[in-house]
Regions:
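Post-transcriptional modification and biogenesis factors for structured RNAs
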Residues: 1-171
Length: 171
């Protein structure tokens, strides 16, 4: 059997060299551990930046740092009072705004028409994306769920949608 080399270390690479034209707007996430998970996803896919809104943990934060494993130092993060404030900022910079939520009219992520640059709004673990933020979206993306629960962990959801965006920018 042929030997396989597994990359075990981190690599130095300038962030600005190949940033994915995606911003993640975190709307009132209550778990700093989930926020750290989103930072790991964002760094792996080279997401342009993260907008932490409301009471969402923002670096530096001890619990966030535990799951971010250093990615909080590699991904730009800005704090906004509300998701609506973040939407206004990114829309003024030409971003198309998508709510990642199980709402009527949402397109499953693999069929969704996604225009870049885009901002993806990810909502609170129990409450979802706020009504105010939903009202400001240009479109909606969802992950189908066939079990009893109508959602998956926000960090896992971020991974699925962000890597779908990455795939589309690479093809």
């Amino acid at each position: 059997m042929k030997a396989v080399t597994v990359r075990t270390g981190d690599v130095e690479a300038p962030r600005e060299s190949r940033a994915l034209p995606v911003v993640l707007i975190l709307d009132r996430l209550r778990s700093a551990y989930n926020v750290g998970n989103v930072f790991r996803v964002a760094e792996a896919a080279r997401v342009a930046e993260i907008a932490a809104c409301g009471y969402t943990a923002c670096p530096p934060h001890e619990k966030l740092e535990k799951t971010a494993r250093g990615c909080d130092k590699l991904v730009l993060c800005r704090h906004f009072e509300t998701a609506a404030d973040a939407v206004a900022e990114y829309r003024s910079r030409g971003y198309v705004i998508y709510g990642v939520e199980t709402v009527e009219g949402a397109q499953w992520y693999w069929n969704a028409e996604i225009r870049f640059p885009c901002a993806l709004i990810l909502g609170n673990e129990a409450l979802g994306v706020s009504e105010e933020a939903l009202s400001l979206c240009d479109g909606f993306i969802s992950l189908p769920t066939f079990g009893c629960k109508n959602s998956i962990n926000v960090g896992n959801c971020a991974a699925v949608v962000v890597f779908e965006c990455l795939k589309r920018t690479l093809v």
